[in-house]
From Swiss-Prot:
NCBIfam families: rplT_bact. GO terms for molecular function: rRNA binding; structural constituent of ribosome. Belongs to the bacterial ribosomal protein bL20 family. HAMAP family: Ribosomal_bL20. It comes from Neorickettsia sennetsu (strain ATCC VR-367 / Miyayama) (Ehrlichia sennetsu). GO terms for cellular component: ribonucleoprotein complex; ribosome. This is Large ribosomal subunit protein bL20.
Length: 117
C-alpha cells in the first residue's frame, strides 16, 4: 500500500482557520493552534450573544415605548394593560417603531389604551 502524505489537506485546513481568525490580536491571528482556540471561543460568544441580542432588543423596545408613553401621562405597565384591555394586538417592536417614526399614530394607540382603562 502506498504512503499517503497529507500536506495539502493540512495546509488547506490551516489556511481556512487563519482566514477565519482575521482581525484577531497578537498570535491569535497567525498561529494555527492559538487561532483555533480563539475561534472556538469566538463561536461560543457568538452562540451566547445571539440569545442575548433578543433580550437586548426587547429591553430597548420597552425603554422606547416607556419614554414615548410618559409624554402622554402614562407609564409602560399601565399602557400595556390598557392595550390588552382595548384588544389592540401590536407587538413591542412595532410600537417602538411607531413611537419614533409616526408619533401621531402612536398617540392614537395611546388614546385607545387610555379609554380602555
Amino acid at each position: 500500500m502506498a504512503r499517503v502524505k497529507r500536506g495539502v489537506q493540512v495546509r488547506q485546513r490551516h489556511k481556512k482557520v487563519i482566514k477565519q481568525a482575521k482581525g484577531f490580536h497578537g498570535r491569535s491571528k497567525n498561529c494555527y493552534r492559538i487561532a483555533l482556540r480563539r475561534l472556538e471561543k469566538s463561536w461560543q460568544y457568538a452562540y451566547r450573544d445571539r440569545k442575548v441580542r433578543k433580550r437586548d432588543f426587547r429591553s430597548l423596545w420597552i425603554q422606547r415605548i416607556n419614554a414615548a408613553v410618559r409624554s402622554f401621562g402614562l407609564v409602560y405597565s399601565v399602557f400595556m394593560k390598557g392595550l390588552k384591555a382595548a384588544g389592540v394586538d401590536v407587538n413591542r417592536k412595532v410600537l417602538s417603531e411607531l413611537a419614533i417614526s409616526q408619533p401621531s399614530a402612536f398617540g392614537e394607540i395611546v388614546n385607545k389604551a387610555k379609554a380602555a382603562l
